[in-house]
Amino acid sequence: MKLKIYIDEAGRGPLAGPLYVGAVLPRQRFTKNHYKDSKILSERQREALFQKIQQTESKNQILYGYGTASSREIDLHGMTKALQFGVLRAVQMILQKVYQAEIIGQLGKSLCSCDAMQGIVLQNLFLEQENTLEAMAQIADIFRGLGLELELSIDGNRTFGVDQTLKCPVITIIHGDALIPEISMASIIAKVLRDHVMIELGKDYPQYNFAQHKGYGTQEHRDLIAQHGPSDIHRKLFLKEYFPEFKKKPKKPKQSKKVSRPPRKKKPLAEKLF
């Protein structure tokens, strides 16, 4: 049986704050897209649809999850790797919900066939605060052993290496957030949850007015960075586009030190021959 999970992200381009990835596992088919891409919705519309998504999950029609990557992780590893982390963490939340819910029917029977040792391993893996790539691969292997194959559909045209980590098909869909209802839901989940976080961060860092621009590179935000300097949640990797002082200076090649040697003594001709 396939577990088809639909994925989209929010917060790829901002100068500050985390990246968020939303994920949706439908338990019924959605033929009409009532959700739309989060980018073309107003904040009020997104909030209303997010509440509808929560209600849809409470009716057992979907399971949803999310994953994040911090600004520090973006600086350390780059955006592609951060997206991989976010996708894997979102998938982990979905699989944890699947495991805990023991969905009725074929999926439930598969989970019930999980032996005690596998169950303990899964619980320990789910409890880890920072799951490694190896741990996520192990979770996917256990589900695969139970006859539950993962299949991911991601908005855009890149897999971020998730297919290699989870050893599962990953379908990329350009403009998927406008075409596929479940990807639209994932887009709204990621956007709304990230906005909530940025509003809260605005209380901790009032000098940047995060509640207004959500960390994106507006002129106001850039002016505030120039005035106050960057905070610890700003992405130094992204700031260099606007602030030359964040560009890495090329390292000067090390010059080899010349070792002074004593002058060689000339040997007499007889010594050279023998």
Task: Describe the predicted segments one by one.
Residues 1-274:
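RNase H-like, Mg2+-dependent phosphodiesterase core
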